[in-house]
Regions:
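Short, positively charged, Gly/Tyr-enriched micro-motifs
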Residues: 16-24, 91-177
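Short, conserved DNA-binding cores of transcription-related domains
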Residues: 1-101
Length: 177
């Protein structure tokens, strides 16, 4: 059995190393270090998205084939798709919707196992980055900095995130007279 990221790694070796060699010749060795870095970053981020997607698909497949799942749940929808904005950019997540065999709430088991809310459109890491930036600058800038690609979190989402945070305020320290 191949490891969960086998295909992404093989594809990177076969295609992207050639692409990187081309970037070295066309950009770096012709004095354009900035262009080289941009091209390299895009390639590495694309690899990250591919890897992330393949790992999630592998986990979904493991869940689907597990004895626990077969005994407890039947597959209601085989391949629901959703887009998730991550630090690497948008990835497409394919997951099955399961119904308990003995009654109860339907569930995306993949979401449960990886700690994702079924309605999340943005990963926790991307939200954390957006929040970090928004605290220092603006909601818009926070949304732009959520991931390392051109994809953005809307400023409304960042605003809701910030306003939705419950913060424990320190007790007021009495002033000495």
């Amino acid at each position: 059995e191949n490891c969960p990221m086998y295909n992404s790694i093989i594809e990177f070796i076969e295609k992207d190393t050639t692409k990187i060699e081309k970037f070295i010749k066309e950009s770096l060795l012709s004095g354009n270090m900035m262009r080289f870095e941009e091209e390299l970053l895009d390639t590495v981020l694309e690899f990250g998205r591919s890897l992330y997607q393949e790992i999630l698909e592998s986990i979904e497949q493991t869940i689907r084939n597990s004895e626990f799942r077969k005994q407890s749940y039947h597959v209601e929808h085989k391949e629901d798709r959703r887009t998730l904005l991550t630090r690497f950019g948008n990835i497409e997540v394919k997951r099955a919707y399961y119904a308990p065999k003995h009654g109860g709430k339907r569930i995306y088991l993949l979401d449960k196992y990886v700690g994702m809310d079924p309605n999340d459109k943005v990963s926790q890491a991307a939200l954390a980055q957006a929040l970090k930036e928004a605290v220092e600058t603006s909601y818009r800038k926070g949304g732009e900095e959520a991931c390392l690609t051109e994809d953005v979190v809307t400023k409304q989402t960042v605003k809701k995130l910030i306003h939705g945070l419950e913060m424990e305020m320190p007790e007021e320290i009495p002033q000495k007279k």
